[in-house]
Amino acid sequence: MITKLNSNLLDVTIHFTDNEHYYSYTVSEIYDPKKADFFKQFFNYDPIVCDVTCNNDLVSTVIHDYLDSDYIFDIIENLNELADGKTEDQFLEKLELLHVYYKCVDAPEIKAACECVEDQNYIQISDCWTDQDLGIALASERGLLHQLEKISTEDTCFENYFDFDAYGRDCRIVEDWQKYNGSFWKFWEN
């Protein structure tokens, strides 16, 4: 049974138990954050509180509505059905059958997806202290600064953003930027 489910746009972390053992997997969805149309997938910034069954108890889990809410709930429902009363091998076998639908990595690679990359494989922006700083830096780096600076009703990839703080916040969530010693850094996946 799934005991905990944390989700953002990129990852769904599953803590799975078969009443004897405890497992943890990360199912990574496939997106290219460097593409402009990546940001069109945002719908709103309202969180969804999901009830996930945990040993006959309901555990409320907050999931930000970056994907279609029905899609998120379908994932939770199906994963609960798969995990309930299944062994680890059965769970992984069923999950592998669903990996195309969920855009997940293949089941044998789930454990590998949980492993951290080498410490040297990271990039750091040392002069960014806030989400707004990060948003400005990333927009400038990607040549998109002018699109964020103008307020327009045009259908652009930044139509949902009204300030650099919101853009930086979502870049941080989506791209797994971490704040450490006053600066932002992230793992760089080769």
What are these regions (language model features)?
Residues 2, 13-15, 86, 150-155:
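Short, flexible coil/linker segments at or flanking structured domains
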Residues 1-33, 37, 182-190:
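Short, extreme N-terminal segment that most often corresponds to the first beta-strand
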Residues 16, 38-43, 73, 91, ...:
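Phenylalanine-focused residue identity feature
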Residues 22, 31-152:
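Mixed-charge (acidic/basic) macromolecular-recognition segments
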Residues 4-7, 133-190:
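Acidic, proline/glycine-rich low-complexity IDRs
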